[in-house]
Amino acid sequence: MSDRLTLLRPDDWHIHLRDGAVLQHTVGDVARTFARAIIMPNLVPPVRNALEAGGYRERILAARPAGSRFEPLMVLYLTDRTSPEDIRAAKASGFVYAAKLYPAGATTNSDSGVTSIDNIFPAIEALAETGMPLLVHGEVTRSEIDVFDREKRFIDEHMRRLVERFPTLKVVFEHITTADAAQFVTEAPANVGATITAQHLLYNRNHMLVGGIRPHFYCLPILKRNTHQVALLDAATSGNPKFFLGTDSAPHAKHAKEAACGCAGCYTAYAAIELYAEAFEQRNALDKLEGFASKHGPDFYGLPRNTDTITLVRDEWTAPDSLPFGDNTVIPLRAGEKLRWRLLEDNA
């Protein structure tokens, strides 16, 4: 088994950078590894049109480390009021690459989200016409639905109908967490893909709940039972081009996570590709990592693959206990624990 792994530089097809002073930290972490990233728009207020996306993009670019060529790929936040004109203007901007469907209340800052998918059918039709993907947080959020069943219910109630109603629409089923979602994407037409996070490949709900509640494993969609984790590993390491890397790295200040009502989100951007390498190594599938991390995503979006490379080496190191996050700190996933792979910063 090789102790050195060289890949085409990967992209992150789902990340949260937040806004304001924290960008100096979050942008540096993602730019360390990734050439491009799909930037989630769930700010307060959300990124609802091309003008707001352009302003957010400029703030991200201003926070890039010196010499960085990292490219943020901007996303619109769909609301009940998003119009086809908003979609067409976003496409014409040249820097908005997708639109995001958050069911209202599904995750952090999603209160402005869509109350009924039927309300945005005209906007979805415009997405299909322009070729822009629809990114879907696939959970039903009604109070009577068990939190562990939200994803499957979304497939049954909405996802099948959405794909059938808009057969030419590119759809990314984001951060899938269940065997049901993996099977749905596998069996769906070629215009349906999915991102998978590192935490859902490496962990299941036992890691979060057994022996004490571990808030830094809490994210949405929530970690599921180990049988779903196995199905996600099967999908990610299969070589199927429908599945690609999306960290859903989502930082919150320490005090907001370690609280009586803690926020959802795992911070993985600081060591994302290293964590994915561990997951793929568990399956003896390191040869499949480059496709998942560096090829399938740009191919799905119709963008060129990166041409430069990164190199990982098998070299154990200890993750930091905390990282700066504006005036606060963020506790990264695996804080204080050993990681088995290390990114060569100089790519030597």
Swiss-Prot record:
The active site is at 248. Binds 2 Zn(2+) ions per subunit. The keyword Ribosomal protein does not apply. The modification N6-carboxylysine is found at residue 100. Zn(2+) 2 binds at residues 100, 137, 175. Substrate binds at residues 16-18, 42, 137, 220, 252, 264. Homodimer. This is Dihydroorotase. It catalyses: (S)-dihydroorotate + H2O = N-carbamoyl-L-aspartate + H(+). NCBIfam families: pyrC_dimer. Its cofactor is Zn(2+). GO terms for biological process: 'de novo' pyrimidine nucleobase biosynthetic process; 'de novo' UMP biosynthetic process. Belongs to the metallo-dependent hydrolases superfamily. DHOase family. Class II DHOase subfamily. Pfam families: Amidohydro_1. Gene3D superfamilies: Metal-dependent hydrolases. It comes from the Bacteria. Catalyzes the reversible cyclization of carbamoyl aspartate to dihydroorotate. Zn(2+) 1 binds at residues 14, 16, 100, 248. Keywords: Hydrolase, Metal-binding, Pyrimidine biosynthesis, Zinc. SUPFAM superfamilies: Metallo-dependent hydrolases. Its EC number is 3.5.2.3. CDD domains: DHOase. Pathway: Pyrimidine metabolism; UMP biosynthesis via de novo pathway; (S)-dihydroorotate from bicarbonate: step 3/3. GO terms for cellular component: cytosol. GO terms for molecular function: dihydroorotase activity; zinc ion binding.
